[in-house]
Amino acid sequence: MSERRNTVVELLGENDVSRTVARIAHQIIEKTALDSEGADRVMLLGIPSGGVPLAERLAAKIEEFSGVRVDTGAIDITLYRDDLRNKPHRALQPTSIPSGGIDKTTVVLVDDVLFSGRTVRAALDALRDLGRPNYIQLAVLVDRGHRQLPIRADYVGKNLPTARAEDVTVMLREIDGRDAVTLTREEGEGDN
């Protein structure tokens, strides 16, 4: 019988995560024309749990780089998930939408990892119940591939092609006490 063990590799460290967030903030400024008059009102809505602190960080960087303060909030997708039958006991997360709502705005959904696309699909369904933005965009720190739905991020910090069996973990100082992105793979004796 072969012994299985997990190997954890740090792919992004503290400085890498910081640079990546700054780069995404610059891209949002450019694509949404935030620094020009007449641009849509832009808001960043984080998908709990990792997307919420990322949205706050992006908003701070956008303000630092452009002088424009964008609204932030959180959108709970729990009741919109398509796996509720498999995992029925999920804690509801708070939804907080900036005053004025989402109608006629550019909403940038923010999440830490894009994988199957199902979380984003649930967020799109939740948004539909809250109003009608002019545009919906997606910003993710990590895109690891393996989509099950036709969903693509507008802003990607790092593309990390992975095997389906590998796990990508995003650690954020607001939640985990430090910033890092790690890859965990299970290996057994004789694996190379």
UniProtKB/Swiss-Prot annotation:
Motif PRPP-binding, residue numbers: 107-119
Catalytic reactions of this protein: UMP + diphosphate = 5-phospho-alpha-D-ribose 1-diphosphate + uracil
GO molecular function, one term: uracil phosphoribosyltransferase activity
Keyword Metal-binding on entry: no
GO terms under biological process: regulation of DNA-templated transcription
EC number: 2.4.2.9
Annotated CDD domains: PRTases_typeI
InterPro entries, per database record: PRibTrfase_dom (IPR000836), PRTase-like (IPR029057), PyrR (IPR023050), PyrR_bifunctional (IPR050137)
Keywords, in A-Z order: Glycosyltransferase, Transcription, Transcription regulation, Transferase
Pfam families registered for this protein in UniProt: Pribosyltran
Residue ranges that the Swiss-Prot or TrEMBL entry lists as coiled coil: none
Family named by the database record: Belongs to the purine/pyrimidine phosphoribosyltransferase family. PyrR subfamily.
Function: Regulates the transcription of the pyrimidine nucleotide (pyr) operon in response to exogenous pyrimidines. Also displays a weak uracil phosphoribosyltransferase activity which is not physiologically significant.
Name assigned to this protein: Bifunctional protein PyrR
Organism name: Corynebacterium efficiens (strain DSM 44549 / YS-314 / AJ 12310 / JCM 11189 / NBRC 100395)
